[in-house]
Amino acid sequence: MAITAQMVKELREKTGAGMMDCKKALEENGGSLEKAVDWLRQKGLSKAAKKAGRATSEGVIGNYIHSTGKIAVLVEVKCETDFVARNEKFQEFAKNVAMQIAANNPAAVDAESVDPAIIEREREVYRQKAREEGKPENIIEKIVEGGIKKFYKEICLLEQPYIRDDKMTIRDLLNDVIATLGENVTIGRFVRMQLGAEEA
């Protein structure tokens, strides 16, 4: 497959990697944008991968209040410098993350912050269901892992499809912001309140 300038541009915008690295990634992966993104991440060439370890001590508290006034969200979005914290794109990202939380009500930012006991309970539910359906033991673990991946997409903010573009996840959106702004950005704590909802 011929690699076009448009494909290289799209990959570069998505990852922030250099033009030649993007071209090589596309060539190595038969023109597949998705595989090229993974290839760049594995090689550590995407800006998000390079910036992941840098401290984020500045930022904003993004907020969203639904037009009905019955749902509100506060989310901590952190970056490295106050210059970026004041950037319009950064603030728009914080607002979009707050809207995502309002719409999808995630339980955690990422898989690492989910209580392991909850994950183990979910695994057991998937195991039992597979056994009841008479699935062979050798494929039950694959079924369980598939179920857990789906579970993460429901409860983990970074794994959820973005409400404004379901072809990308919040993690993809975060990586785009990192590439665009040129510094590490992280999503910290969040709180979602809904009028009349029971506290968990």
From Swiss-Prot:
Under the heading InterPro entries, the entry gives: EF-Ts_dimer_sf (IPR036402), Transl_elong_EFTs/EF1B (IPR001816), Transl_elong_EFTs/EF1B_dimer (IPR014039), Transl_elong_Ts_CS (IPR018101), UBA-like_sf (IPR009060)
What superkingdom heads the lineage? Bacteria
Q: Which GO terms describe its cellular component?
A: cytoplasm
**SUPFAM superfamilies documented for this protein:** Elongation factor Ts (EF-Ts), dimerisation domain, UBA-like
The UniProt keywords, alphabetically, are:
Cytoplasm, Elongation factor, Protein biosynthesis
**Is Cytoplasm tagged as a keyword?**
yes
Q: Which Pfam families match?
A: EF_TS
Subcellular localization, as worded in the UniProt entry: Cytoplasm
Molecular function (GO) terms for this protein are: translation elongation factor activity
* Signal peptide start-end: none
Name the HAMAP family for this protein: EF_Ts
Return the similarity comment: Belongs to the EF-Ts family.
The record's function comment reads: Associates with the EF-Tu.GDP complex and induces the exchange of GDP to GTP. It remains bound to the aminoacyl-tRNA.EF-Tu.GTP complex up to the GTP hydrolysis stage on the ribosome.
The protein here is known as Elongation factor Ts
Per the UniProt record, the source organism is Nitratidesulfovibrio vulgaris (strain DSM 19637 / Miyazaki F)
